[in-house]
UniProtKB/Swiss-Prot annotation:
Its main location: membrane. The chain crosses the membrane at residues 12-32, 44-64, 77-97, 125-145, 172-192, 203-223, 238-258, 265-285, 287-307, 331-351, 358-378. This is RH-like protein IIR. It comes from Pan troglodytes. GO terms for biological process: ammonium homeostasis; ammonium transmembrane transport.
């Protein structure tokens, strides 16, 4: 006898997704136009390459990074692509509407596509905490709310604190982490008895997740430098990120071996620890004056990530119901906080070096930005979690958590489940 849960998704998903897509097409028809300026060909190619790197990070990197579940790897990869495609469309419109007053035609440029892709990346980070417990209709709601909340944070911080695009982007780590953890806290937590093994990682899916981590590792310098305008700052960001993630790999392997009683290396530790340096230096990557400092940050971040992978999953599983293998959000929250602290220290150093006496004011500004982003992330995440609990979304039953068979057609299982 087949389950009733796929049938409910079949009724809700096409209506919801296609109606939303039709609405987006109409909005693009009435309110958007392409940039008609004659851009330098060399600059156009360079800008496209950065955008291409971001798309690879999002579609392949984060898509496969979340695919380590034993019975939920198909959904993790495909749902991530679905959220990316939807999130980019909505983010382009939202960023255009919020950046101009009174609202008019949204001019689409390669830079606006890069900005929209970074907004969609926020969803791919936060969804790690809830994948396996929600269906695509709920993910549609989550994408719309989170992209809107992040766009609002960017606009408010930019207007109040006069912050540039790069600094707004670097709040994404903390924002996405706390948003995802807040949503997870509102969802049903424990798995039913007899199904606890479904949220465990398996060998082949874990290898796919490592493939995603490798793509992220290769393209993280492009992500940290994507929205910087100055060529010198972009160069510094690329160099410092490269050194930081290189040290993170060495630290991840060594720390994982050290954390195991028999000195064995854990693949689950590797998935996020190899990226730790890139997250930690993201906020200040263009300000770090020397490679040794970036390398030290990569070392510290790698140790924090390995320690978090060892000790945080038990706490997150008990309190938030997050699977032991889904520690990206909790890791990114600590690493993002470390990055914010390093940025404040470097800003203070720069202020003293230039003889500017307003050190306290600069520190208060940075703390204000961080506090505002965190507050909006927690608030909007809680509201989203409560919204996703409504019965109208036809959420999968707890017994069907972390199960591809709820959503996918398996030719060798014609009878159902």
């Amino acid at each position: 006898m087949s389950s009733k849960y796929p049938r409910s998704v079949r009724r809700c998903l096409p209506l919801c997704a296609l109606t939303l897509e039709a609405a987006l097409i109409l909005l693009f028809y009435f309110f958007t136009q392409y940039d008609a300026s004659l851009e330098d060909q060399k600059g156009l190619v360079a800008s496209y390459q950065v955008g291409q790197d971001l798309t690879v990070m999002a579609a392949i990197g984060f898509g496969f990074l979340t695919s380590s579940f034993r019975r939920h790897s198909w959904s993790s990869v495909a749902f991530s692509l679905f959220m990316l495609a939807l999130g980019v469309q909505w983010a382009i419109l939202l960023d255009g509407f919020l950046s101009q007053f009174p609202p008019g035609k949204v001019v689409i440029t390669l830079f606006s596509i890069r900005l929209a892709t970074t907004s969609a990346l926020s969803v791919l980070i936060s969804v790690d905490a809830v994948l396996g417990k929600v269906n695509l209709v709920q993910l549609v709601v989550m994408v719309l709310v989170e992209v809107t909340a992040l766009g609002t944070v960017r606009m408010v911080i930019s207007n109040i604190f006069n912050t540039d695009y790069h600094m707004n982007l670097m709040h994404i780590y903390v924002f996405a982490a706390y948003f995802g953890l807040s949503v997870a806290w509102c969802l049903p937590k424990p798995l039913p008895k007899g199904t606890e093994d479904k949220d465990q990682i398996a060998t082949i899916p874990s290898l796919s997740a490592m493939l995603g981590a490798l793509f992220l590792w290769m393209f993280w310098p492009s992500f940290n430098s994507a929205l910087l305008r100055s060529p010198i700052e972009r160069k510094n960001a690329v160099f410092n990120t490269y050194y930081a993630v290189a040290v993170s790999v060495v630290t991840a392997i060594s720390g994982s071996s050290l954390a195991h009683p028999q000195g064995k290396i854990s693949m689950s530790y590797m998935h996020n620890a190899v990226l730790a340096g890139g997250v930690a230096v993201g906020t200040s990557c263009h300000l770090i004056p020397s490679p040794w400092l970036a390398m030290v940050l990569g070392l510290v971040a790698g140790l924090i990530s390995v320690g978090g992978a060892k000790y945080l999953p038990g706490c997150c599983n008990r309190v938030l119901g997050i699977p032991h293998s889904s520690v990206m959000g909790s890791n990114f929250s600590w690493l993002g906080l470390l990055g914010e602290i390093i940025y404040i220290v470097l800003v203070v150093r720069h202020t003293i070096w230039n003889g500017n006496g307003m050190i306290g004011f600069q520190v208060l500004l940075r703390i204000g930005e961080f506090s505002l982003a965190t507050t909006i992330a927690l608030t909007s995440g809680l509201l989203t979690g409560l919204l996703l609990n409504l019965k109208i979304w036809k959420a999968p039953h707890e017994a069907k958590y972390f199960d591809d068979q709820v959503f996918w057609k398996f030719p060798h299982l014609a009878v159902g489940f």
